[in-house]
UniProtKB/Swiss-Prot annotation:
Domain of life, source organism: Bacteria
Annotated EC: 2.8.1.4
The keyword Coiled coil is assigned to this record: no
Occurrences of domain THUMP (ranges): 61-165
Task performed by this protein: Catalyzes the ATP-dependent transfer of a sulfur to tRNA to produce 4-thiouridine in position 8 of tRNAs, which functions as a near-UV photosensor. Also catalyzes the transfer of sulfur to the sulfur carrier protein ThiS, forming ThiS-thiocarboxylate. This is a step in the synthesis of thiazole, in the thiamine biosynthesis pathway. The sulfur is donated as persulfide by IscS.
Pfam families documented for this protein: ThiI (PF02568), ThiI_fer (PF22025), THUMP (PF02926)
Keyword Nucleotide-binding: yes
Localization in the cell: Cytoplasm
Binding site for ATP: 183-184, 265, 287, 296
Protein name: tRNA sulfurtransferase
Family indicated by similarity: Belongs to the ThiI family.
InterPro entries: Rhodanese-like_dom, Rhodanese-like_dom_sf, Rossmann-like_a/b/a_fold, ThiI_AANH, ThiI_fer, ThiI_N, THII_Thiazole_biosynth_dom, THUMP_dom
GO biological process, one term: thiamine biosynthetic process
Length: 482
């Protein structure tokens, strides 16, 4: 099978040297993501597209799913590469491929041609379109907004028949821009803002301020790992966790109620800036949107920025909440966010919307900055690929099994598209489906007299979810690793 990868249009208008660099990076990213699916897979770069060739037809759906999530790809064409002798031969092959597809529908033919030929692209469009119209009585030519567009590409003596088109997410390939550090809370905003910077070509590292204990960190790890695995797995990234409970305690004790929200955000920016400096990261990313909460007025945002010299990027600054939730739904983080606790909003009962710099600085004089320094020094730094190993250490009390008894039920917690692409079939045991993002709210509805064996392909999500469910009091949970 063969796919032609079309580049994000902004890549094609770059200078020759920049364009070649972007294409080279994108080619490497594609190869890194797809190699586990097919060792014989070939990725070949050209000036205006990238070819992907694979032999294992059973992996087609999985390969397509991965390609649609790699930044830098505008769309993917599944194609069949055939020789041809003349224009009539092109028509015959097109009719064979598209007869059923255009029956009872309006259609048009679009041709792209490269090389020297005795005919033009328009000649082929007219000939093939007219022939299809004659041989498929129920079909009708319609050049504007047809129901079906028959796409053909001709390269020298090769005919490329497009069998399917899949839309990519666009953007720049990850690695073409510098690294950023996302302040992730697990909510709607931080997940979407992280995705938007990945889509713009940045390698996104994650910094989490833990205000709610182990369960909160587990939940945020799941979000970060999901975003990385789905959109950024071409590169290694860090997940840094900072215990901020002592900092919050100091603020509650030493800072005036109305100033707490802004002071807390300034402390977060200071801490994140130190982490960014430690690892050579150029900018911070937050999910703040103008006016969404009291700390996100222009006056307060400016004061928050003044806490550090590090550049702060706010990709959602002009987005409303409805649009942010829609984006979260599209990228798959909505269900995470809906079950994630929010702690920052409850720190102050009557927060100021227009903080005064002198007053904020006066309140911060009462703060013991040694606490902040200590928390930054004690921050944990994990390669996001090692989250599975760290989860394994933390869920030692959660049993991992490869076989099952009469009371066991396997619970496939993979996302719906993964289950459709690679269905789980195990003889001798019932297999049920409940995507991981629904476990927090729906696991309690399952038959608790059964022993539930959580399954995911790599064991990362199943271990994290098993730990979370154990902490919620569900002891009838194990991890299934065949």
């Amino acid at each position: 099978m063969k796919f032609i990868i079309k580049l994000f249009p902004e890549i094609t208008i770059k200078s020759q040297s920049v364009r070649l660099r972007f294409i080279k990076i994108l080619t490497g990213n594609i190869r890194n993501v797809l190699k586990p699916y097919d060792e014989t897979l070939a990725v070949v770069r050209h000036w205006d597209n990238i070819e992907v060739r694979a032999k294992d037809e059973s992996k087609r759906a999985a390969i397509v799913a991965e390609l649609t999530r790699i930044p830098g790809i505008h769309h993917i064409l599944a194609v069949e590469d055939r020789p041809y002798t003349d224009v009539h031969h092109i028509f015959e092959q097109t009719l064979e491929m598209n007869r059923e597809r255009i029956e009872g529908k309006t259609f048009c033919v679009r041709v792209k041609r490269r090389g020297k030929h005795e005919f033009s692209s328009q000649d082929v469009e007219r000939y093939v379109g007219g022939g299809l119209n004659q041989h498929v009585a129920s079909a009708q030519v319609q050049l504007n907004r047809p129901q079906v567009t028959v796409n053909l590409e001709i390269e020298d003596e090769r005919l490329i028949l497009v069998t399917a088109r899949y839309e990519g997410i666009g953007g720049y390939p990850i690695g073409t821009q510098e690294d950023v550090l996302s302040l992730i809370s697990g909510g709607f905003d931080s997940g979407v803002s992280s995705y938007m910077l990945m889509r713009r070509g940045c390698r996104v590292h994650y910094c989490f301020f833990n205000l709610g204990g182990a369960a909160h960190e587990i939940g945020v790890r799941q979000v970060a790992h999901y975003l990385w695995k789905r959109y950024g797995s071409t590169h290694r990234v860090r997940f840094v966790a900072i215990n901020f409970e002592p900092v919050v305690g100091e603020i509650l004790e030493k800072v005036d109620d109305g100033q707490m929200g802004v002071v807390l955000k300034r402390m977060m920016v200071r801490a994140a800036s130190k982490i960014a400096e430690r690892y050579g990261v150029q900018a911070l990313v937050t999910g703040e949107a103008l006016g969404q909460v009291s700390s996100q007025t222009l006056t307060n945002l400016r004061l928050i920025d003044n806490a550090s010299d590090t550049l702060i990027l706010r990709p959602l600054i002009s987005h409303d909440k409805e649009h942010i939730i829609k984006l979260a739904r599209e990228i798959g983080t909505e269900d995470f966010a809906r079950t994630m606790p929010e702690y920052c909003g409850v720190i102050s009962k009557s927060p100021t919307v227009k903080a005064v710099k002198a007053k904020i600085e006066h309140e911060e004089q009462n703060f013991d900055f040694a606490i902040l320094e200590r928390m930054v020094e004690e921050a944990t730094n994990v390669d996001i690929r090692e989250i599975a190993e760290k989860a394994q250490e933390e869920v030692a009390e959660v049993e991992t099994v490869a076989s099952f008894s009469h009371n066991d039920v396997i619970l496939d917690i993979r996302s719906n598209d993964e289950q459709e692409a690679r269905p789980l079939e195990v003889e001798g045991v019932v297999v049920k489906s409940l995507p991981f993002y629904k476990l927090a709210t729906q696991f309690g509805d399952l038959d608790q007299s059964k022993s539930w064996l959580l399954y995911c392909e790599r064991g990362v999500m199943s271990r994290l979810q098993a730990l979370y469910l154990h902490e919620q009091g569900f002891k009838n949970v194990k991890v299934y690793r065949p």
